[in-house]
């Protein structure tokens, strides 16, 4: 059995006078490699997303800039710095396809917000101006400030992590607002900010607001990536078995 192939949604870098670049941070790549997967970049081409996901065993929706609030029917807050429109359309499409087709998906920071918006939910556009809290959620870099999160032990995330409370990094000024229908809150910060979501009807559709890829030596991060890759491995086996069942009688199995 080959290692599972996991696509990472790419960001777009625009510098004046230069050609645009599609990229992902290597911390995502290294985290997936350590967990036993083969990571690949998903280009920001939403018109090809439906065909591309057929080749993947899992999808990682990475962190980045803000989702355009027009997607959930709100005016743009002055602090909102929206991501490249090509990336936004691509990420939202990937989230919808993954949920519809049962493809294992892990959303990180912006990724969990995209999962919520794609399903019809909303975001808090700026925690600092909307929520009375002593927690600095928007510190940069992400490990400059940390806070505790409480995880619901009855959820997929709770079963992955075991501990009901643990400490995470934080680097986000936006957060989950109204939770979309069909999604479930899995973790919260002490101030009530949602720190995790999942679709309980999906084999693995899990998002976290913190950055486990920036916590490589911590057991919680290893557990999250390990569970994600294992779900992708199971999905790959199921695809392989389904393809074998459809093969003509007497046909040689594919390598």
Give, region by region, the residue ranges found by the protein language model.
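N-terminal beta1-alpha1 cap of cysteine-dependent amidohydrolase-like domains
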Residues: 1-106, 117, 124, 128-161, ...
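Conserved G/P- and acidic residue-centered "switch" motifs that form tight phosphate/ATP-binding loops
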Residues: 109
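Active-site-proximal beta-strand elements of phosphoester/diester hydrolases
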Residues: 206-210
């Amino acid at each position: 059995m080959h290692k599972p192939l996991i696509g990472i949604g790419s960001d777009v870098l625009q510098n004046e006078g230069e050609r645009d670049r599609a990229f992902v941070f290597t911390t995502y790549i290294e985290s997936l490699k350590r967990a036993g997967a083969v990571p690949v970049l998903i280009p920001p081409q939403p018109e090809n997303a439906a065909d591309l996901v057929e080749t993947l065993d899992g999808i990682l929706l990475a962190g980045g800039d803000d989702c355009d609030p027009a997607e959930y029917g709100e005016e743009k807050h002055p602090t909102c710095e929206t991501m490249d429109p090509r990336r936004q359309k691509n990420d939202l499409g990937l989230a919808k396809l993954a949920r519809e087709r049962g493809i294992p998906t892990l959303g990180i920071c912006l990724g969990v917000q995209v999962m919520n918006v794609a399903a019809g939910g909303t975001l808090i556009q700026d925690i600092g101006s909307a929520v009375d809290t002593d927690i600095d959620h928007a510190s940069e870099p992400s490990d400059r400030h940390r806070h505790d999160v409480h995880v619901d032990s009855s959820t997929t995330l709770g079963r992955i992590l075991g501990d009901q409370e643990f400490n995470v990094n934080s680097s986000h000024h936006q957060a989950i607002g109204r939770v979309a229908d069909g999604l479930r809150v899995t973790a919260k910060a002490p101030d009530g900010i949602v720190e995790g979501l999942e679709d309980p009807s999906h084999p693995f559709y899990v998002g976290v607001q913190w950055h486990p890829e920036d916590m490589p030596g911590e057991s919680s991060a290893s557990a999250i990536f390990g569970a994600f890759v294992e779900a992708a491995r199971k999905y790959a086996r199921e695809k392989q078995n389904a393809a074998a069942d459809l093969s003509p009688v007497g046909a040689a199995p594919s390598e």
